[in-house]
């Protein structure tokens, strides 16, 4: 873990997460806040159209940034995704901690910038996640779990280097998954499925009501996605010792893509 801490590539990846998170939050939430303007000038703009625009803004921004910085940091841009990849033994504990810090700080910075730019908007929530009227905490938690589960499951499947059947764009597939999560959850919770995104809005607005839902739900969803994919759908043969080595070293060998049996389980070992 100490050796990884000293590497320039490690810190470059952390900075990439920070900068990409700023762009992601600014673009996606900025798009949502922009609804105040067309609604006033164009009365035909409805809630359904608004939800689609928000969903596309979040999904396409993730796809774009994943393509832009994915080769540098992996473009997690979400603590739930980072937790999922940690539990899947693809990153070290140190990297996970630093990524989550970078993501949260990036979200705060972006939301603060948006707060200044959109200060004239009435009732400006800055994209604050909140339970819709009639939705209780248990229901909101369930929505966040399901929305995040499908996202992390998509990330694990799309980035699985054992697969030879993948075609098209991985970042675009993940972006569509983010958009799908928003289409599902936006009417119930405002769609968190990203604790850092929720945290930034709560910090700047000083509103932490029901905020725990937007951490606990995504983290449970991420853990369930790893359980389903790594232990049921596409299990890997790695014991506890190997997993601990990956968590501490952060270095994982490439999958054996030349294996005769591509359906065989692949063991992940640190270098």
From Swiss-Prot:
It is a multi-pass membrane protein. CDD domains: MIP. A motif (NPA 1) lies at residues 78-80. Signal peptide: none annotated. Gene3D superfamilies: Glycerol uptake facilitator protein. InterPro entries: Aquaporin-like (IPR023271), Aquaporin_1 (IPR023274), Aquaporin_transptr (IPR034294), MIP (IPR000425), MIP_CS (IPR022357). Residues 1-11, 68-70, 85-92, 156-165, 227-271 are cytoplasmic. NCBIfam families: MIP. Forms a water channel that facilitates the transport of water across cell membranes, playing a crucial role in water homeostasis in various tissues. Could also be permeable to small solutes including hydrogen peroxide, glycerol and gases such as amonnia (NH3), nitric oxide (NO) and carbon dioxide (CO2). Recruited to the ankyrin-1 complex, a multiprotein complex of the erythrocyte membrane, it could be part of a CO2 metabolon, linking facilitated diffusion of CO2 across the membrane, anion exchange of Cl(-)/HCO3(-) and interconversion of dissolved CO2 and carbonic acid in the cytosol. This is Aquaporin-1. It comes from Bos taurus (Bovine). The lineage of its organism: Eukaryota, Metazoa, Chordata, Craniata, Vertebrata.
